[in-house]
Amino acid sequence: MTEQTQDENKLIAERRAKLEHIRTNCPANGHPNNFDRKHKAADIQAEFGHNTKEELEGMGIERSIAGRVMAKRGPFLVIQDVSGRIQAYAGKDVQKDLKEKFQGLDIGDIIGVTGQLHLSGKGDLYVNMEEYQLLTKALRPLPEKFHGLTDQETRYRQRYVDLIVNEQSREAFIMRSKVVSAIRNFMVKKEFMEVETPMMHSIPGGASARPFATHHNALDIAMYLRIAPELYLKRLVVGGFERVFEINRNFRNEGLSPRHNPEFTMMEFYMAYADFNDLMDLTEEMLSSIATELCGSPQLPYGEHTVDFGGPYARLSMLDAIKKYNPDNATIQSMTYEEVKDVEFMRDLAKSLGMTVEKFWTCGQLLEEIFGETAETQLMQPTFITGYPADISPLARRNDDNHFITDRFEFFIGGREVANGFSELNDAEDQDRRFKAQVDAKDAGDDEAMFYDADYITALEHGLPPTAGQGIGIDRLVMLFTNTHTIRDVILFPAMRPQAN
C-alpha cells in the first residue's frame, strides 16, 4: 500500500466518522432532501457582479444556492454548481454550529445556503450563511495535489471526479451537447424527420465492420448490435419518408485508438431526389452555420492549425489526392485508373511504399490503403475525397462516366475522416450482385465484409427513389469543436481495458 493510499484511507475513515456523528446527533441532516435551490452561481454573478459593495448592502438581496464545496479560505467557502462558482461566508457563530453539528465541512461536501448577497473586500460576491444544510457528506476526498486530475486513465475511469475538478472537461461536454442540439435543429429546419431504428439487428449491415454478437433468448436467434442504421433508414425512404435522420449509437467490435471507440455516436441522414453533390453542399452549409453559431466564427483553433469551416471546401478524387501528397513518386504520378484496376500493379506499389498487404485486398482496397498511408493525415482543412472504388462501396451508386468508381465521398478534417456519404445504389439487381461479392470476400477472410440482406433487396425491388445519404461522426466532430485530440476526451464513459486488480 502506497503512502498516498494510506493517507486517502485515513481521510475516508475520518469522513465516515463525521457522517456517523451526523446520523447520531442530527438524524435529519444525514441525507436531507428538502432544500429549495432557487439560484445558480453564474446567474448571480451575471446579475450582480457589476454592483458595488454599498449598492448591494442597500438592496438587501437574498439568494439560495447549493453545490459542492471546492475550497475553504478562512471563513469563506467556494461553492460550485453546474453553472460556475460563488462564495459563501461562514461567520464565527456559523462555524461553531457547523463544528457541533457536522464536525466541520470538508472539501467535496454538498451544501445548501440561503442568505444576503454581499461583496467581499477583494470584490468577490458571496452569500452570507444565514440558513444552511449539509445535503451530502462526501466520503472520499477530491484530488488536491494538482489542479484537477492529471492521470488520463483515472480521468476516463472516474469521469465523475474529472467533471468535478476539471473545468476543461465540463466545457467539452457542454460543447458536445450544443453541437448535437445545433445539428438536430439544422436538420429539422431543412425538413428532415428524426426517426429511431433498431439497435439490434438480425443481419448486421450498412457498413464494413466487425459486429458485436449476442443471442435473443425468446426468439432463439443470433443478434448483432448495429454497426450502422443505413439499411433501415433507406427502407423508410422506400416507404415514402423522403428526408429522415437519426442521431444514435453505433457499435463496432474493433480496436481502441485516439480516434476509435467501439461505441460511438453517428448522425445519419437520407434525402430523396438528391445526389452526393447535394450532400457536400449541405455539409458545408451545416458546419459553417454551426461553427459560427456556437463559436462566433467559422475559424476554429485545432492544435497548431486553424480549421476554416467557412468554405468552400476542397474536393478532389482519391487518386488525385494520392498524387498530390506523393509528388516525388514517379509511379504514382503517372498512375491511371487502368493501372489501379490491375491488382498485381497495386500490390507491388503498396509493397514499394513499405506497406503490409493482405492477400484478400482488392484493387479498391489497395487504393484506399495507399491513400490512408500517404495522404489522409495531410488533410487538415475540410476536404471531400471523391472517386471511391465500387468494390469498397457496396451500397453506393456507380459513377456514370467511370464504373470502377462510385458517386461517393469521405469528408476529412484534421487528418481524419469525419463523414461518409454517397448517392445511394437503388438498382436492386446490382445491389444483389454486390452483396454476393461481399459474401465471397467474407469467405476469403475479410471479416469486415458485409452480410447478404435479402429483405433489403426486397425493399429495393419496391423502388427506392434517387437518394443520397450520409453519416457524420459526432465524436470526431466534437473533437474539432473542443480542440481535443483523443476521442476519449469527448465520450463521457469511453471503453477501457480492465484494471489489473
Swiss-Prot record:
Mg(2+) 2 binds at residue 417. This is Lysine--tRNA ligase. It comes from the Bacteria. It holds the Pfam family tRNA_anti-codon. It catalyses: tRNA(Lys) + L-lysine + ATP = L-lysyl-tRNA(Lys) + AMP + diphosphate. The keyword Phosphoprotein does not apply. GO terms for molecular function: ATP binding; lysine-tRNA ligase activity; magnesium ion binding; tRNA binding. It is found in: Cytoplasm. Its EC number is 6.1.1.6. It comes from Shewanella halifaxensis (strain HAW-EB4). Belongs to the class-II aminoacyl-tRNA synthetase family.
